[in-house]
Structures are given as structure tokens and as C-alpha cells.
């Protein structure tokens, strides 16, 4: 199994169980699904017998519909307007560029040109995206973008390839 972590915060962003697709060698688009999770206790897991005097004891249980990738990686929803996202992205891309200059200098020009091409389309449809950050909520870390596929039902996330560290387990 491969886990992709934010290179700055170290937060897990996604794993290969979500079948990431590398787009133009610059971003991963990762499809996700809605799932229902239980927020309560399963009474079968409690090691006790129901009281004979009081009838059946109930355990309150609630369910919630969540996106599996958000739930599994413990991503946190955040919000940006276009102006604040541009400011964040400028600083984040600078940090990625500095990292690439140290670790993989020949990748810098490819990264710069391709990320600019991709982000032009993001900004054209900026209001369609939701924003998620890693579990540590590090303000310098990656902000993943979430939108829906053309069917309007399937959520997908966008992660910058060069902002990730891949670990194999």
C-alpha cells in the first residue's frame, strides 16, 4: 500500500486505495465516495448483559454521511475566497519550488509550467471547489481541492504531486 503525505505537514492526504490518477505529471485527481459512518456505540461490543429488571437498555446511535477519503485521512474542511487562496497558493508554490530546487532541480521548470496551466482552469471554476487541509491543520501545508465529476455525484480531490511524499507500506 502506498500512502501520500503532505511534504510540509507530514499529514496523510490519501492512499492508493482510492486509485489516484496522475494528471499531466503535476496533480493527482483522486475519486472518492460518500459513505455512512456510525457515531455511536455498538451495544454488541459492550461486555455486559442487559438488566433483567429494566427491560432492554438502548444505546443511542447516530449516523453521518461523509466522504470516505475525508474520513479515512481525517482531512479538515476549510474555506477560502479567490483572493485569499491566491495568496496562500503563491506562498505554497514557492515552498514547493524551494524543495524541488534542493531535491530535484530538473523538475522545477516542468512543475512551474504545468501547475500554472492546471490552476488557470481551477480559478475559472473556483466557486465549484471546496477546500480541505490535513489533520494537523498546519497553515503552511497543502490545501486539497474537492469538486464533483460531471455526473454531479462523485466527489474528487486534487493534490499537487510535488507537494507529496509517497511512503510504501
From Swiss-Prot:
Q: Does the keyword Lyase apply?
A: no
Which Gene Ontology cellular component terms are annotated? cytoplasm
| UniProt xrefs under PROSITE patterns | TCTP_1, TCTP_2, TCTP_3
GO MF annotation list = calcium ion binding
Q: Which Gene3D superfamilies match?
A: Metal Binding Protein, Guanine Nucleotide Exchange Factor, Chain A
> Where do the TCTP domain residues begin and end?
1-169
Which InterPro entries does the annotation name? Mss4-like_sf, Mss4/transl-control_tumour, TCTP, Translation_control_tumour_CS, Translational_control_tumour_p
Its keywords, alphabetically, are: Calcium, Cytoplasm
Q: Which subcellular locations apply to this protein? A: Cytoplasm
Chief location bin:
cytoplasm
Q: What does this protein do?
A: Involved in calcium binding and microtubule stabilization.
Instruction: Report the family membership.
Output: Belongs to the TCTP family.
Q: PANTHER family, alphabetically? A: TRANSLATIONALLY CONTROLLED TUMOR PROTEIN-RELATED (PTHR11991), TRANSLATIONALLY-CONTROLLED TUMOR PROTEIN (PTHR11991:SF0)
Official protein name in the record: Translationally-controlled tumor protein homolog
Q: Gene that codes for this?
A: TCTP
Amino acid at each position: 500500500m502506498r500512502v501520500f503525505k503532505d511534504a510540509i505537514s507530514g499529514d496523510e492526504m490519501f492512499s492508493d486505495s482510492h486509485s489516484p490518477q496522475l494528471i499531466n505529471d503535476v496533480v493527482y485527481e483522486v475519486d472518492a465516495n460518500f459513505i455512512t459512518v456510525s457515531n455511536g456505540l455498538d451495544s454488541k461490543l459492550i461486555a455486559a448483559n442487559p438488566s433483567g429488571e429494566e427491560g432492554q437498555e438502548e444505546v443511542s446511535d447516530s449516523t453521518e454521511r461523509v466522504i470516505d477519503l475525508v474520513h479515512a485521512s481525517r482531512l479538515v474542511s476549510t474555506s477560502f475566497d479567490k483572493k485569499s487562496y491566491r495568496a496562500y497558493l503563491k506562498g505554497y508554490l514557492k515552498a514547493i519550488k524551494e524543495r524541488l530546487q534542493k531535491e530535484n532541480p530538473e523538475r522545477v521548470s516542468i512543475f512551474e509550467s504545468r501547475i500554472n496551466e492546471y490552476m488557470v482552469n481551477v480559478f475559472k471554476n473556483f466557486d465549484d471547489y471546496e477546500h480541505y487541509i490535513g489533520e494537523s491543520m498546519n497553515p503552511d501545508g497543502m490545501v486539497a481541492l474537492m469538486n464533483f465529476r460531471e455526473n454531479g455525484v462523485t466527489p474528487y480531490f486534487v493534490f499537487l504531486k510535488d507537494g507529496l511524499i509517497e511512503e510504501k507500506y
